[in-house]
Amino acid sequence: MSELLAIPLKRTLEVDFATELSKLIDTTSFQTASFFQSDILKVVDARNNAIAPDISIDGLSALKEYYVILLQLEKKFPNNQIEFTWFQTLSQKSRGTSQYSLQWEKLTIIYNIGCMYSLLALNSNNDAAESLKTSCLYFQNAAGCFKHVLDHQKNLETIPVVDDATLNALTSLMLAQAQECFWFKAVQDKHKDSLIAKLSQQIVDFYCEAINDAQRGKLIRSDWINHLKAKKAYFSAVTYYRIALSFNEKKQFGNVVKALQMGLQFINESTLSSQAKFKTVVESSLKEAQRDNEFIYLQEVPSELPSIKPALMVKPSSSATLLPSIKKDETLFKDLIPIEVMEYCTAYNERQDEYVEQRVTNPLASLNKLLKESLTTFQIPQGLTKVSEAELSHYQASLNNLLINNKNVQVQLDNIEQILNEEAFTDNQLRLKHGTLNWTLPESSTTNTAYYEKLKKLRGYLDEGSAIDKQTNELFQSIDKNLIGSEIRLPESNDPLTNKIKMIIQERNDYIDRTRRKSSEYRILPKIITSYKKNGTVDFEPIFIGHLKYFDEDLRYVNSTKEENIKLIEEVNLSKKNNPGRSGIEPKKMVRIDPRELYIEDLRYSFKLLDEVKENLSAGTAFYENLITSTSNLYNEVQEYDTARRAEKARLDKSLTFEDQ
């Protein structure tokens, strides 16, 4: 067996993986690259071994080892941060292509694994039985690799590794040569001619598919296509020669003549080196068959023969068996925690705090408020103490801090807008300078839309915050500070129900404080890190749902407190109804209010306003913390966007300026 084809390996430029990975680690994780030098060197060595491997099993192993490393890099790093350059080697002119894509690099390596299998198949072929089996397997493995690339490159965001038509042609070529190995083994084993004819017909079908796809593709050169046509013609002749021998055994001598005539027609179309010898055999057999039929058998020679059903014996090997997977004991960067994972933790912490507030602390505070409101007709306000001048100053300072935070966020948002506007301006200027057709970068208006939308949303939040800040400040200024800052000299209530409610309210306030402390100490970070190290994925939602079950006991407490509240309010209402004139409880009066009652009402109102101010200050502080974080995140995103766009514009501007010179 000879005249088989192997697919040449793609060639590449070296990549400074050490520098590129170090930059990525320093910019995308909370660790520094110095902790991962050993892993980085393994990546560097693996690629160096894979870019120009020996045509050997060791070379194949080097390619597969680098493939496994790329699988790990995909799990740990962004796909589009490192540039790779590869040169195709199928056509007469080698052309280079560069892409920022780990996935593209991985599929290119799989393509080269397929090329390596085709080269090993040729090296293994010495016509011995075992070598034929090995070559047959290797050609099927090569077909499996090319098919894998074809099936998966449709998901790439880059240009394909090789155009689809060429990959289809290479897959069919590898299967044709694998089937050829099987056919040759059948010839050696002297199987029936009818079976050998079916085997060779399948080879013809594969070569036919390869020719059609190669002519549609962009890379396979004409001498290869001519070779495929010669192989197709040769095996068409083989098919008819073998079917002629089968007809001869069945004494169908007219069919023998027709089959040999067809075989001679095809062998004349073949340009293979083995064509001449085989042509002599076919011509000799045809002359003998014609002579015998004309003088002895006198059978009619048909105008055509029945179609020959092919016998398919090969298929592309499954990539699951060809390509290795990551071994647990060989995991690289296993302790690397990307910033993305930490951002998930922060987001889940915020959701946990919100969950606790909505399900536990806020309901308890609302229940306490209902209890307090049920006591509004009691003569003596409970829990009121003099507000110190320092405390009032603290509230005023907190209000001032809200205003400062508001201004700082406003400045930061203005800076973000300025960066986006300047980036769009420079893009427009360069587009005017070089012309729209030459300036191929996407317009800023299409790339910065998401940032402007986020900016608009943050400005909306800021305006809402400003309105609430103004309202809170007006509320605080309306409080009678002399009244609440003076000593309150009122006798303690002797009413048992009032004292009971006061104690319950305090217990609930203590429970709120304990729950908040519990939530701040019980964070999801350790669970997320453990899950990420184990699975390498960022699907943490099931973990978070399980994490929140820790607060089920608190939810049950809130439900029991709701029932308690209903009973207490019923007791208060009953007490008012049954004891309208007893000491400590008086019905509301619709007539003239005496100075003591007026003082109590003013005191209640001022403290109510102060409570609202404190609630607004607490909410405002949390609001601005979140807004500052969101604004900083957007600022960082816009800076990264602007930096990337600057680099792209600089490269294109330089390239276009150079072309104009």
Curated annotation (Swiss-Prot):
Positions of post-translational N-acetylserine modification: S2
Note: Present with 2881 molecules/cell in log phase SD medium.
Keyword flag Cell inner membrane: no
Regions that span the bilayer: none
Keyword set, alphabetical order: Acetylation, Coiled coil, Cytoplasm, Nucleus
Stored CDD domains: BRO1_ScRim20-like, V_Alix_like
Similarity remark: Belongs to the palA/RIM20 family.
Protein name: pH-response regulator protein palA/RIM20
InterPro entries: ALIX_V_dom, BRO1_dom, BRO1_sf
Pfam family name, one: BRO1
Binding partners and assembly: Interacts with SNF7 with its BRO1 domain. Interacts with RIM101 with its C-terminal domain, probably binding to its two YPX[LI] motifs.
Domain BRO1: 3-371
Coiled-coil annotated spans: 388-422
Subcellular location: Cytoplasm; Nucleus
Cellular component per GO, a single term: nucleus
BP-aspect Gene Ontology terms: invasive growth in response to glucose limitation; protein processing; sporulation resulting in formation of a cellular spore
Signal peptide: none
Physiological role: Required for the proteolytic cleavage of the transcriptional repressor RIM101 in response to alkaline ambient pH, which is necessary for sporulation and invasive growth. May act as a scaffold protein that recruits the calpain-like protease RIM13 via SNF7 to its substrate RIM101.
